């Protein structure tokens, strides 16, 4: 959750990716309230020195590692301030509210009083939140760039929520509900394109604890191997073979995001447009929008849908699709590694369109049905044919999966008349 504080320094810049080639280092303060120390970290003030070393420090380190994992591709690196004074020994009534909304107006002042204004660059409190509380965190959108609000945020004692709220602090709103990315409720560990663009735009030209200019060429698409329009029949899945290279031979990550607008940038907080869920950036260059099924370990013959996509359920029409490729460091994405070998991730973006042709959906059916089938019995497969997409010369290939849709290695028939 974020609240906007409208000041001139919080206005969104208009520059697009890849940014300004500057790796920014920040000192991140994560103050711990009494409720977080006792309830979440299971700390005992009677054993404070031991629990500080055994419980607080490991939590801070886990936060640092995770925050860097998701922010380094944006050109930001964080060093968590390991200072015992950031563990509160007295209740701060405005923050130790496990059910109600904590008050963030004085959060920055509390940190300044504890360790000094010049000892950190951005702060994020952690405090205990009940599961039924109204939210898991709140912060000032763009607060990292406002001196009086640079510590005005809180999160429940969870590294993912800390990173999410920091996304707000560096200017990103929520993406449309349904996304799997860090700035939505999906729970995956990455920023989607709209968030990346917003955060990098706002960071451009700003100072940090340490700015390091890095020369790095962006990856390039093989335009001859890419398409501007990907045409599929209604109800179908979508697979795109992305062809890109990097001049320095860096490791590449691939992702994509699409929506019903003419511009993916319109996927922001409050939007309700149908859209394709963002991919977790992957090393495979094949972007595939298809359901994946996972076998349930507790019940035989039962599976559930994981990382489902709305593409097969999309209405006919044209959808914007942005395909992103970025290079990443081959070493660990830690503060110490990037201090020694600075790296600034660069992006190539392929803007395209997905055209979903309306008509009869494929919808394969089996006879007899699964619950009526006996081993060895012949099975008849039937399917719908979209005559607006397929022609009389179209042929069908039937591939089967034995691992719940992860791979389709068994091909029964090739060239069946549709």
Where is each model-derived feature located?
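Fold-level signature of zinc-dependent metallopeptidase catalytic domains
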Residues: 14-132, 136-139
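Exoplasmic/lumenal beta-rich domain surfaces
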Residues: 82, 255-314, 392-418
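The catalytic-center signature of Zn2+-dependent metalloproteases
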Residues: 84-102, 134, 138-208, 262-264
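Proline-centered linker/hinge motifs at extracellular inter-domain junctions
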Residues: 216-221, 360-362
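Short, solvent-exposed loop/linker segments at the N-terminal edge
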Residues: 229-238, 370-377
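Extracellular acidic, Ser/Thr/Pro-rich low-complexity tracts
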Residues: 232, 242-249, 327, 384-390
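C-terminal edge beta-strand
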Residues: 333-357
């Amino acid at each position: 959750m974020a609240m906007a504080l409208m000041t001139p320094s919080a206005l969104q810049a208009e520059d697009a990716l890849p940014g300004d080639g500057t790796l920014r280092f920040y000192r991140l303060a994560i103050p711990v309230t009494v409720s977080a120390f006792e309830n979440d970290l299971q700390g005992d003030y009677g054993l404070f020195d031991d629990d500080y070393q055994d419980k607080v420090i490991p939590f801070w380190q886990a936060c640092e590692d995770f925050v860097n994992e998701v922010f380094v591709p944006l050109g930001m690196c964080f060093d968590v301030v390991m200072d015992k004074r950031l563990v509160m020994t007295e209740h701060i009534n405005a923050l130790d509210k496990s059910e109600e909304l904590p008050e963030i107006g004085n959060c920055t002042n509390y940190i300044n009083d504890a360790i000094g204004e010049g000892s950190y660059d951005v702060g994020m409190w952690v405090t205990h939140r009940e599961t039924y509380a109204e939210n898991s965190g709140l912060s000032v959108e763009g607060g990292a760039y406002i001196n009086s609000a640079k510590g005005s945020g809180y999160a429940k004692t969870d590294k993912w929520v800390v990173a999410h709220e920091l996304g707000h602090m560096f200017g990103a709103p929520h993406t449309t509900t349904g996304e799997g990315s860090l700035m939505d409720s999906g729970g995956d560990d990455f920023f989607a394109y709209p968030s990346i663009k917003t955060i990098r735009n706002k960071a451009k030209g700003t100072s940090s604890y340490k700015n390091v200019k890095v020369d790095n060429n962006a990856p390039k698409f093989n335009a001859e191997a890419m398409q501007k329009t990907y045409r599929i029949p209604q109800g179908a899945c979508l697979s795109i073979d992305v062809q890109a290279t990097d001049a320095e031979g860096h490791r590449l990550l691939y992702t994509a995001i699409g929506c019903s607008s003419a511009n993916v940038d319109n996927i922001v907080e409050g939007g309700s447009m149908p859209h394709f869920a963002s991919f977790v950036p992957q090393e495979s260059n094949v972007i595939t929008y298809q359901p994946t099924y996972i076998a349930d370990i507790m019940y035989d013959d039962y599976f559930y849908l994981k990382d489902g996509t709305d593409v097969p359920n999309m209405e006919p029409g044209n959808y914007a699709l942005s395909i992103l490729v970025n290079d990443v460091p081959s070493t660990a994405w830690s503060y110490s590694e990037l201090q020694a070998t600075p790296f600034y991730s660069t992006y190539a973006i392929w803007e395209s369109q997905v055209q979903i042709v309306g008509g009869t959906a494929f919808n394969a059916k089996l006879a007899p049905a699964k619950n009526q089938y006996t081993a060895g019995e012949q099975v008849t497969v039937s399917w719908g044919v979209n005559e607006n997409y397929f022609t009389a010369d179209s042929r069908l290939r039937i591939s089967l999966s034995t691992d719940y849709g992860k791979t389709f290695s068994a091909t029964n028939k090739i060239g069946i008349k549709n």
